[in-house]
Regions:
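Post-Walker A helix-loop "phosphate-sensing" segment adjacent to the P-loop in P-loop NTPases
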Residues: 462-472, 487
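Hydrophobic anchor at the beta1->P-loop junction of P-loop NTPases
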Residues: 445
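Hydrophobic positions on the alpha1 helix immediately C-terminal to the Walker A/P-loop
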Residues: 456
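P-loop NTPase motor core of the ASCE superfamily
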Residues: 128-131, 433, 512-567, 711-840
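Conserved lysine of the Walker
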Residues: 453
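Walker A (P-loop) phosphate-binding loop of P-loop NTPases
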Residues: 450
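Extended, folded cores of ATP/NTP-driven motor/assembly subunits in large transport
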Residues: 1-406
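P-loop NTPase motor domains
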Residues: 64-76, 371-429, 435, 476-701, ...
Length: 840
């Protein structure tokens, strides 16, 4: 009996027809994760293992050697090796870590950190200040699929060859997360969980069946693939370039030469896969060459055959002394819509086909279902007839294949995200001067006028202040006065305040070595006083007299008497000499002359109030301090002495530095301290800076000087080399004298790296560039900030004047910055309250 007589209901046949479909999951390779093998079992009975590497900005020698070592490993027959770079728009982990580091509970600091993170997060779809280049994280994956289990020995060989590229095994959940994002939406994170064990007696579905979600479209239409609310296109080379160079390969994923090539960047997420097959023998190469050479052809077919003959000829040149592999390069771009995907594909095609050494590139359509899976880990099925029918592979020597590998992306810095920059290709750069892998935390900055130095350093000081560091800046010119005000810091004008800077204050020295170092510095300071007007060198006898006088002053507890105590010892020499051997009759007039030369620095002298009595410069409780020396430039006899005393006093504080609250010392405009005339000796002044670098290295502080040219280090004499050796990081901004610095053996750059350095530019007001050379990497970074942070960091005279005018008109510093940046102060305070609530 029918439930509805006479009504034709849904039949099983119609029901089955409604649910029958082609499942793209059938193309995906992964069946199950086998924990014992740390590998995926794949649909073709292969075993897949994956790693993540740290991509390099450029093809440095150690990178190419690592790749050559990898490609020369004797893998089993039928092995497929894939190197895959993914321009990942998901930068939230780095931004979250950046915010977690900004622990100082100050409304302005927290607002700047939040707005920086939001600005860069929004930049994943393109930053206007960078000509719409998106901010991203280039990730590099290595996938190896073998017909037999890879085994511990081969796995160890792979990891040893790539150790210098930061290789790590990729957990299965991370790889599955990447797969899910490709198919379901690259802009959002995806879970990595998957079923691997049977439940309720039912076997777990294959991993391939757990990747693609039911909701988003998955449709192949001509040259487009609609997947995960995004549109993808694929490009492959129809013919390779006649030859490949490292620089040419670098440009396959975007220009690297600066603003002139900003339009040569792929404006969204993309994936570049180089699949390497190890099955083709040299016999097959020679056989194909003979067939092609014997062909007679005309018209367009002749052109095609000619290109293939040229390709084979290039290969045969290497055949006698190099291993050969087959490679399949594929480039996928992912747009938010068809228009963006089309524009991205056109730009990628232009990059590959540009001179010199152009490739012939085609957009794929019919083969898209196969090529999509083949461009993902383990998704290329190396059955010989299939590869032959696919016709997308090229044979080349492993040296050429290593250059084609997508390992050159962009400079990425290194360490925790204490500082955030953006690379020329959009890489989010993280940098930490206090990274534990670096053997010292010191730095040098070099920048000619107008290169963006003050903005860069204001930003650097603000970022470290935000994470709890103590900031000490010695400056000439007031570049940090506004920042000091905004950070509720202490601004000390040395020429205006009646401070006592007693060079014999040894209270912070922690051990005998520190005390002797402090005494040696005090001797250099007093020697500078004794020759203040001439800056001439002192003789060995003069040095030893001063050293004996200062040792007596300290040992006898007369340190608070300052220069008066030294003059007393010198004037009565040899009465207080330590032994008969220290009494030299002909040095009596020398000692009295030294005492006479120090008269201006005694308590009754013109400058005596600076150096006699207990020290009153106590900044140990201050979080942010600027010591301004501008007023003293008009007193040349005093200027160098004050510089030495101030540098010495500030760097002695490094004895108190701690890992959780490091001290950060910056000496700006150091070259102005080192002005020199014929016959003058600047070694004593240079030694003050050298001591700063040594103390910072010993006590895990950070000490840095700012120069207008790296050649200024020659003014420091032998101490210049000490500074270079004790400064792990260099910030080199736009300059015109780097060639000369190389000639002077100050910089050890040549060729490509030197050209890269000389390409650094300040593109104000959009961004400024800086060449960073650190133990964690070398390359060019761009400082680009949101409007609110811009007004915190700027030191341009007209913009500082606008800020000061608002403060004089009654705004507090935070309100002044908000008004200039067009931000409601209530938003800043409300945001800070919300953050405080979360912290609670």
């Amino acid at each position: 009996m029918s439930a509805r007589p006479g009504h034709k209901g849904l039949s099983y046949q119609r029901l089955r027809a409604a649910v029958t479909r082609d499942a793209y999951s059938d193309f995906l390779p992964m069946v199950a994760w086998v924990e014992e093998e740390e590998a995926f079992l794949c649909i073709d009975d292969g075993w897949g293992q994956a790693w993540e590497l740290v991509p390099s900005a450029y093809m440095f020698a150690h990178v190419q050697q690592a790749l050559l070592g990898l490609l020369n490993i004797h893998f089993p027959e039928g092995t497929v090796l894939q190197l895959i770079t993914f321009a990942d728009p998901l930068i939230d982990p780095a931004l979250d870590a950046y915010l977690d580091m900004k622990v100082r509970p100050d409304p302005l600091v927290q607002a700047s950190a939040r707005r920086t993170a939001d600005y860069l997060r929004g930049g994943t779809r393109g930053l206007d200040a960078l000509h719409a280049i998106p901010v991203r994280d280039f990730r590099l994956f290595l996938a190896i699929k073998t017909r037999v289990k890879l085994g511990a020995d081969l796995r160890r060989q792979v990891e040893e060859q790539l150790a210098k590229m930061g290789i790590r095994r990729l957990p299965p959940d991370e790889l599955i997360s990447v797969y899910r994002r490709i198919f379901n939406g690259v802009f959002a994170p995806a879970p990595g969980v998957f079923l691997s064990e049977s439940m309720g007696g039912m076997p777990a579905p294959s991993i391939a069946r757990q990747i693609i979600e039911a909701g988003p479209d998955l449709c192949f239409e001509g040259p487009e693939v609609f997947l995960g609310n995004q549109v993808a296109r694929c490009l492959t080379p129809k013919a390779p370039a006649r030859r490949i160079t490292a620089e040419r390969a670098n440009r396959l994923m975007g220009g690297m030469r600066g603003s002139a090539e900003d339009s040569d960047q792929i404006g969204g997420p993309f994936l570049y896969c180089l699949s390497v097959l190890f099955d083709h023998s040299q016999f097959e190469i020679h056989k194909r060459a003979q067939i092609l050479s014997a062909q007679k052809a005309a018209g367009s077919f002749a052109v095609e055959v000619g290109k293939q003959i040229e390709e084979i000829g290039w290969i045969l040149d290497e055949a006698s002394n190099s291993r050969f592999v087959s490679v399949i390069p594929t480039m996928w771009v992912f747009g938010r819509d068809s228009a963006q995907a089309r524009e991205m594909a056109a730009r990628a095609k232009r990059l590959w086909e540009s001179e010199p050494l152009p490739f012939m590139v085609q957009e794929e359509s019919y083969l898209l279902p196969v090529l999509l899976a083949a461009s993902l880990p383990f998704g290329l099925y190396p059955e010989k007839q299939t590869i032959k029918l696919l016709e997308r592979d090229f044979r080349m020597a492993v040296k050429a294949a290593s250059l084609m590998a997508p390992v050159q992306t962009d400079f990425r810095g290194g360490g925790r995200p204490a500082l955030l920059y953006v690379g020329r290709k959009g890489q989010l750069i993280t940098l930490d001067l206090f990274d534990p892998r670096i053997n010292n935390y010191n730095f040098i900055v070099s920048a000619e006028s107008g290169a963006g130095k003050s903005f860069l350093l204001n930003n650097l000081c603000q970022q470290y202040y935000a994470q709890g560091a103590l900031i000490r800046i010695i400056d000439i010119g007031g570049s940090y006065r506004k920042l000091c005000t905004l950070c509720s810091g202490r601004y000390i004008d040395i020429g205006e305040e009646r401070l006592v800077l007693n060079p014999f204050d040894m209270g912070l020295a922690l051990d005998g070595e520190d005390k002797q170092s402090a005494i040696a510095m005090a001797v250099a300071i007093v020697a500078e006083m004794a020759n203040a007007s001439t800056r001439k060198p002192v003789t060995t006898s003069e040095w030893n007299l001063l050293k004996s006088a200062i040792q007596w002053t300290v040992d006898s507890g007369r340190g608070d008497d300052g220069i008066d105590a030294v003059r007393h010892w010198l004037g009565r020499y040899p009465d207080n000499a330590a032994s008969d051997l220290d009494r030299v009759d002909h040095l009596v007039p020398v000692a009295r002359e030294l005492a006479f030369n120090l008269r201006d620095f005694g308590s009754q002298g013109a400058y005596g109030h600076f150096f006699n009595g207990p020290s009153t410069l106590d900044i140990s409780r201050d979080e942010f301090v600027v010591l301004e020396l501008e007023r003293l430039k008009a007193l040349p006899d005093l200027f160098n002495v004050i510089v030495m005393v101030v540098v010495n006093a500030v760097t002695q504080e490094l004895y108190l530095s701690a890992r959780d609250k490091p001290r950060f010392v910056l000496c700006d405009e150091a070259a102005q301290f080192m002005t020199r005339s014929d016959g003058q000796d600047l070694s004593r002044l240079a030694e003050a800076f050298g001591q700063g670098y040594r103390r910072a290295r010993k006590y895990q502080g950070s000490f840095g000087i700012v120069l207008q040219s790296m050649n200024d280090l020659m003014l420091f004499g032998g101490t210049g080399q000490v500074i270079l050796e004790n400064a792990a990081t260099k910030f080199l901004l736009q300059g015109s004298t780097y060639d000369k610095a190389v000639d002077n053996k100050i910089l050890d750059y040549s060729g490509f790296v030197l050209d890269l350095l000389k390409s650094v530019r300040n593109a104000k007001p959009n961004y400024s560039e800086v060449f960073i050379d650190s133990p964690l990497g070398l390359g060019i970074a761009r400082l680009v900030v949101d409007p609110f942070s811009y007004w915190i960091n700027t030191s341009a005279p007209n913009e500082v004047a606008a800020f000061e005018a608002l403060v004089r008109a009654g705004r507090n510093p935070l309100e002044a910055v908000c008004e200039l940046a067009g931000v409601d102060p209530a938003q800043i305070l409300a945001g800070n309250c919300r953050q405080g609530g979360r912290a609670a």
